[in-house]
C-alpha cells in the first residue's frame, strides 16, 4: 500500500511538473499566426507528456498546461479546444510509442509517433477554427500549425534523449 501511494504521488508530481513545462514552453516564444492563434514550442513538451507519462496523466498534463498558456496569453476562445487537442496528442504519443518502440529504435519511433500526433493537432485546429472563422479561412493556419508541429517533434525528440539519461521520468 505504501509503495502504491508513493507511485501515485510521484506520478502526480511528474504530471504537474510537465504541465508547468508545457505552459512555460508555450508562452516562452509566441509567434502570431494568421488567424488569432500563435506558434509556440509547447508541442515538444506535449509529446514528452505522452512518451514519459501514462495516458491519463499525459492527457491531463498536456491539456492543462497548454490550455493554461492559452488562457494566460489572452486566447480564451482556444482553451477548450486546446485542452482536448493537446491531451489527445499526448494519448497518441503514449500509445503510439508503446506500439512503435516494439518495431523500431527509440528515436525513429518517437519521430513517427510525433508526426501522427502533430497531424492530429493540425487537423484538430483546422476543424475548430473552421467552426469559428469558416473552413476556407482556417486553411490559412494549416501551414503555420504544420511548422509548429515539425518544431515540436524536433524539440521533443531532442529532450527525450536528455530525459532518458535521468531517472526522473521512468515510464509510468
Model region roles, listed by residue range:
Residues 1-172:
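Loop-helix junctions at membrane interfaces
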Amino acid at each position: 500500500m505504501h509503495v502504491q501511494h508513493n507511485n501515485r504521488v510521484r506520478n502526480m508530481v511528474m504530471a504537474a511538473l510537465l504541465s508547468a513545462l508545457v505552459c512555460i514552453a508555450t508562452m516562452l516564444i509566441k509567434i502570431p499566426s494568421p488567424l488569432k492563434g500563435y506558434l509556440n514550442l509547447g508541442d515538444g513538451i506535449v509529446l514528452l507528456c505522452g512518451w514519459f507519462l501514462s495516458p491519463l496523466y499525459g492527457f491531463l498534463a498536456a491539456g492543462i498546461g497548454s490550455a493554461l498558456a492559452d488562457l494566460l496569453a489572452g486566447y480564451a476562445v482556444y482553451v477548450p479546444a486546446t485542452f482536448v487537442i493537446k491531451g489527445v496528442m499526448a494519448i497518441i504519443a503514449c500509445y503510439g510509442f508503446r506500439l512503435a518502440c516494439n518495431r523500431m529504435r527509440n528515436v525513429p519511433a518517437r519521430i513517427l509517433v510525433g508526426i501522427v500526433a502533430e497531424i492530429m493537432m493540425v487537423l484538430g485546429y483546422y476543424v475548430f477554427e473552421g467552426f469559428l472563422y469558416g473552413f476556407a479561412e482556417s486553411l490559412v493556419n494549416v501551414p503555420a500549425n504544420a511548422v509548429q508541429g515539425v518544431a515540436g517533434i524536433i524539440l521533443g525528440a531532442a529532450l527525450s534523449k536528455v530525459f532518458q539519461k535521468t531517472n526522473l521520468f521512468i515510464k509510468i
